[in-house]
Each structure stands twice: as structure tokens, then as C-alpha cells.
């Protein structure tokens, strides 16, 4: 399977780096997309290679999507192409994993109405206002959507996401 990660500078380091390596460990191809090719830097200084610019991504070529948190989703959600990629993959029923502030992109894509999920508590009201039921749990699985709250939930988050990739 081909898995896409959407992010930008300011990502929560472990929320991108752990899924990147964990998904590869399962034998899947993982691609990072951002505003442009090159590198992005996390909140704590880790850098990650960017394989594709948002404008180069064809969502039909990917089987699953990961939306890490940190500050990155605040700016990723402003990119129309990134939001369109997210909307298409979510609505096509492809596995989508979000953590922390990652659901901000799902909110902008308008796909959360009637769904159950979680996020960092600081965007709880935003998730609810988008029509989702917010649940305070380390991981929530609702169909193709796997969501978690923060880095402390990484292991449960990836455990459940990897199940959807099998």
C-alpha cells in the first residue's frame, strides 16, 4: 500500500516520525507531502524529507492518509489542494489517521459530520462544531477514521491504523 502523510513546518515531531517508520516497518510505501519538496522541520527540530508538493499529489494513487498534529495543520488546512486531497481520500473510505491538531484539516474538508473521534482537547469544540462526537479516549476508530489525542497515544493510534492497512 501507498500511504500519504500531509504536513508542514511546525509538526509535532513524534506524531510524524513514529507513523513514518511504523508504517514502513509493516512493508508499506510512505510519502510525505507539503507545500513544496525539500525538508520540513518539527517543533523540536527534527527534519523530514518531503517527497511531493501538495500540487503533485493524486489522491487516487494513495491507499491511506496520515494527518499528524502540532502547528502544521493550522497552515496545511489553508491549502486548497491539501484539503481536497483529504476530502477525497476520506470520502472514498480510505483509512485516515489523525492525531492532536490533525483533525483541523478534516474540519476544513467538511467530512466530520456524524462521525466519532478525538483530538487534542484544545480543538475539542471545533471538532464538535464540525458535527462530530468528540470522545476523550486514547484512540477512537470510526469506520475508516482512526484518531488520537496526543503523543502519549501514539502506540494505540498506530496499532489501530495498521490494522486498517492489513
UniProtKB/Swiss-Prot annotation:
Residue stretches making up the PfpI endopeptidase domain: 1-166
Keywords, alphabetical: Cytoplasm, Hydrolase, Protease
GO CC annotations, alphabetized: cytoplasm
Subcellular location: Cytoplasm
GO biological process, one term: proteolysis
Pfam families to which the protein is assigned, alphabetical: DJ-1_PfpI
Reactions mediated catalytically: N(omega)-(1-hydroxy-2-oxopropyl)-L-arginyl-[protein] + H2O = lactate + L-arginyl-[protein] + H(+); N(6)-(1-hydroxy-2-oxopropyl)-L-lysyl-[protein] + H2O = lactate + L-lysyl-[protein] + H(+); S-(1-hydroxy-2-oxopropyl)-L-cysteinyl-[protein] + H2O = lactate + L-cysteinyl-[protein] + H(+); N(omega)-(1-hydroxy-2-oxoethyl)-L-arginyl-[protein] + H2O = L-arginyl-[protein] + glycolate + H(+)
InterPro entries to which the protein is assigned, alphabetical: C56_PfpI-like, Class_I_gatase-like, DJ-1/PfpI, Peptidase_C56_Deglycase
Residue stretches spanning the membrane: none
Keyword Cytoplasm: yes
GO molecular function: peptidase activity; protein deglycase activity
List of catalytic residues: 101
Enzyme Commission code(s) on record: 3.5.1.124, 3.4.22.-
Family recorded in the similarity comment: Belongs to the peptidase C56 family.
Assembly with partners or alone: Homohexamer formed by a dimer of trimers that assemble into a hollow ring structure.
Described purpose of this protein according to its UniProt entry: Deglycase that catalyzes the deglycation of the Maillard adducts formed between amino groups of proteins and reactive carbonyl groups of glyoxals. Thus, functions as a protein deglycase that repairs methylglyoxal- and glyoxal-glycated proteins, and releases repaired proteins and lactate or glycolate, respectively. Deglycates cysteine, arginine and lysine residues in proteins, and thus reactivates these proteins by reversing glycation by glyoxals.
Name recorded for this polypeptide: Deglycase TK1284
Lineage, opening ranks: Archaea, Methanobacteriati, Methanobacteriota, Thermococci, Thermococcales
